[in-house]
A protein has these predicted regions:
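Thiol-based oxidoreductase modules, predominantly thioredoxin-like and allied folds used
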Residues: 3-5, 19, 27-42, 60-62
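Flexible, glycine-rich phosphate/dinucleotide-binding loops
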Residues: 10, 40, 76
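Local sequence-structure signature of Cys/Sec-based thiol-disulfide redox active-site neighborhoods
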Residues: 1-21
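Non-globular targeting/processing and membrane-anchoring segments
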Residues: 24-28, 44-51, 62-136
Length: 136
């Protein structure tokens, strides 16, 4: 897997260790981590709605063909943050900043309460594609 990440990103600090643990369990899974900000040529191949969202995990089969991607966070975490963003609409800039800081703190707790299981499930579904028979 090719990974684009940065140490300052909360989603990276939550999800990259999950991938690293899976790589330790699956000998066929090799992981190469690239700092996003130093590899914009790679990053720009995997934009999300035109943005450089991280982490990006890109998985390949033995032939080097892409079989799937995991980008940013699992659906439960994404829904949580979208809800938090909607709740701060109309607040002052300072109130928004404070509320979003709290939301990110709450998200870290939610990862430990189970959101990381969604990350595992998503990655495993991608990896299972390695073993799917060719469609005729």
């Amino acid at each position: 897997a090719v990974v684009l990440s940065e140490s300052w990103c909360g989603d990276c600090t939550e999800n990259v260790p999950v991938l690293a643990k899976l790589a330790s369990l699956y000998p066929f899974l090799s992981v190469r981590i690239f700092p996003r900000d130093e590899n914009l040529d790679i990053m720009d191949r995997y934009l999300t709605l035109g943005k450089r969202t991280i982490p990006v995990f890109v998985f390949f089969d033995e032939a080097g063909e892409e079989i799937g991607r995991f980008i940013e966070r699992p659906p439960g975490a994404h829904a949580f943050m979208e809800s938090a963003r909607k709740k701060v609409e109309g607040l002052s800039a300072e109130e928004q900043k404070k509320a979003m800081y709290q939301a990110r703190s709450d998200l870290r707790k939610l990862y430990r309460q189970g959101f990381y299981h969604e990350t595992i499930s998503m990655i495993r579904k991608i990896l299972e594609k390695r073993y799917e028979p060719e469609n005729s």
